[in-house]
Amino acid sequence: MDKKLVGLMLIFLLSFGLFTMATVFNKPLTRFTRAKEELIPSSQSSMLFAWPLTAKADGNQQVEINVFVRNSKNIPLENKKIVLTSSLGTLKENNIATDKGGKATFHLVSNTAGIANVTALIDNQVEIKQQLTIKFE
């Protein structure tokens, strides 16, 4: 082969390699190592619902609490562990994983009258911004 042709091919391959490396690796490394955004729960989009909001403090009447875990695009997330905390009463379930619809259901009872403030934590990392207030009388 001609030395000029070999030299041009070598320059081309080196230029192409440098361009490819600059294009691929110019982005932060965290972009390649982070979890997909679709799997990250959103503290804003996730929701808490309870029914009834007022219950008897007899230890028998249950308040059903539903937690819906969503990502930032409001898509339900499955298999996310939810831990509820309540300032009053007893949660019959705790540390439940969400179903295909992103839903986990808990039940709260109390023997003491007062106000229960309920918060939810997703995967021990993301606290849902919305909180519930349930009255036991």
Task: Outline where the language-model segments fall.
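The feature marks long extracellular or luminal low-complexity segments
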Residues: 1-137
